[in-house]
Amino acid sequence: MNQGANKTVLDRYLRLDIPDQKCQAMYIWVDGTGENLRSKTRTLNFTPKSPSELPIWNFDGSSTGQAERSNSDVYLYPVAVYRDPFRLGNNKLVLCETYKYNKKPADTNQRWKCMEVMTRAADQHPWFGMEQEYTLLDIDKHPLGWPKNGYPGPQGPYYCGVGANRVYGRDVVEAHYRACLCAGINISGENAKVMPAQWEFQVGPCEGITMGDDLWMARYLLHRVAEDFDVVVTLDPKPIPGDWNGAGMHTNFSTEAMRGPNGILEIESAIDKLSKVHEKHIKAYDPHAGKDNERRLTGHYETSSIHDFSAGVANRGASIRIPRGVAEEKTGYLEDRRPSSNADPYVVSERLVRTICLNEQ
């Protein structure tokens, strides 16, 4: 239990009435790691209905790896507003972009570039669906439910499993699912993964920039929910070395043409384009230019090799998978299985649109 935490006592205060015109707005942003999130709250005298109504704020960037101490203020520009599933009422979660003292995007602000690309490709209506895999850990960073001095049984019974000896952490998963729905995130499902204590949730279909916004906010909610259960979430793509599956962020992608009659031809064309820029995508698909994915994309445990591009129907060992139903109906989408679990969804979606929609190499 976190020191000083008492959820029963906290609930007493969360049920207190606050004036109708007051709103607690929690500003949320990606920090200097490009992976972790930070947040802080301010009181408003109105209930915002859109990001444009919210004031620009700032924070100490020297404490988040985003500025020098001698010039530490970094600006927060609100870009998306969600209902707050923790405080409820009129209270809001506010996703923000970060800008430096000179009003230029911070180094880890990947959203502005993604927004430019999505605007240019808007007439093609790019849709995304991202499958966020993650692993639950005890507070001591040991996989949740695993024996302290050993390992669970081999992989096999855990995927979509049922039972206390097969799944660990379902309370966190269910609470997160409901929190996302309450917040207004387009979450579409969840399931237990092949490795015990590993789970996945899916967000989408989302069009354009909404994909990155919803996924980052869903990640924030996951960490906050896990905090309430004294559980740690890791997005490490290979948290446990050895004969255990890694974690990815498989990304489903389509354009209006792919979803139309005989869209399989557009899908095949997209795969051909992707095959020519494999290395560029690998560098974009984790925060460390491919170093994280080197541990995961080995050609084993339902992954492709990081060094080779491949594609196939219903092939979970390929870089790009065409679902069986898509191949049969000749319309639909493709699945890019290369992105790492800790990849930035703005970077992944931007890279796909640049390659497939804008023909940039």
Swiss-Prot record:
Q: Where in the cell is it found?
A: Cytoplasm, Cytosol; Microsome; Mitochondrion
EC class name: ligase
For this entry, list what GO says about its biological process. glutamine biosynthetic process
Which of this chain's residues are annotated to bind Mn(2+) 2? E133, E200
Enzyme Commission number(s) from the entry: 6.3.1.2
Entry's family note: Belongs to the glutamine synthetase family.
Q: Does the keyword Cytoplasm apply?
A: yes
Q: Which cofactor does it need?
A: Mg(2+); Mn(2+)
- Would you say which domain of life the source belongs to? Eukaryota
What is this protein's name?
A: Glutamine synthetase
The disulfides recorded in the entry are none
Quick one: which residues bind ATP? E131, E200, F201, Q202, V203, G204, P205, N252, F253, S254, R316, R321
Which InterPro entries does the UniProt entry name for this protein?
Answer: Gln_synt_N (IPR008147), Gln_synt_N_sf (IPR036651), Gln_synth/guanido_kin_cat_dom (IPR014746), Gln_synth_cat_dom (IPR008146), Gln_synth_gly_rich_site (IPR027303), Gln_synth_N_conserv_site (IPR027302), Glutamine_Synthetase (IPR050292)
Q: Which GO terms describe its cellular component?
A: cytosol; endoplasmic reticulum; mitochondrion
> Which reactions is this enzyme annotated as catalysing?
L-glutamate + NH4(+) + ATP = L-glutamine + ADP + phosphate + H(+)
- Major localisation: cytoplasm
Residues that coordinate or bind L-glutamate: D243, W244, R316, R337
Q: Where is the GS beta-grasp domain?
A: 23-103
Record keyword Nucleotide-binding present:
yes
Q: Keywords assigned by UniProt?
A: ATP-binding, Cytoplasm, Endoplasmic reticulum, Ligase, Magnesium, Manganese, Metal-binding, Microsome, Mitochondrion, Nucleotide-binding
Role according to the record: Glutamine synthetase that catalyzes the ATP-dependent conversion of glutamate and ammonia to glutamine.
Source organism per UniProt: Panulirus argus
Molecular function terms from GO: ATP binding; glutamine synthetase activity; metal ion binding
